[in-house]
């Protein structure tokens, strides 16, 4: 299935093909799911309910690319149903004025376009100083 990221493989810091090769080279088992860009949790739920019987994936996430007043970049990974309060998140990480990063910064720092953000983006994000935060509720997930 083609999407914006697929059509721009040559512009990505690490292409999806290179990511698959890296996982295979590291002997990391994985299942590959291809889908159109999903911009909202609602879109994600509709897509997965229509594609996969019994909702076979046991952990559904939402990824938020945020930036603060000091121009620090963050990738937050939450359970898809968790309600996020950006003001509270500011206090939790001692940031000021968290807001969503622009599509241009998203591509520059994580190497993807909106609708294609995942924790794997940190392969690009780490070298660009993006800080990664996982919600602790994932400890309960397989």
Regions found by a protein language model. Name each.
Residues 1-142:
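Extended, low-hydrophobicity, polar/charged segments
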């Amino acid at each position: 299935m083609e999407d914006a990221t697929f059509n721009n493989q040559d512009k990505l810091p690490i292409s999806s093909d290179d990511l698959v090769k890296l996982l295979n080279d590291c002997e990391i088992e994985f299942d590959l799911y291809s889908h159109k860009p999903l911009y909202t949790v609602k879109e994600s739920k509709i897509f997965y309910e229509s594609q996969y019987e019994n909702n076979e994936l046991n952990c559904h996430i939402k990824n938020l690319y945020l930036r603060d007043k000091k121009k620090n970049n963050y990738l937050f990974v939450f359970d898809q149903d968790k309600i996020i309060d950006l003001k509270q998140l500011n206090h939790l990480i001692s940031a000021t004025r968290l807001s969503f990063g622009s599509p241009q910064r998203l591509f520059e720092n994580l190497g993807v376009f909106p609708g294609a953000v995942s924790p794997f983006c940190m392969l690009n994000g780490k070298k660009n100083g993006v800080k990664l935060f996982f919600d602790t509720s994932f400890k309960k997930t397989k």
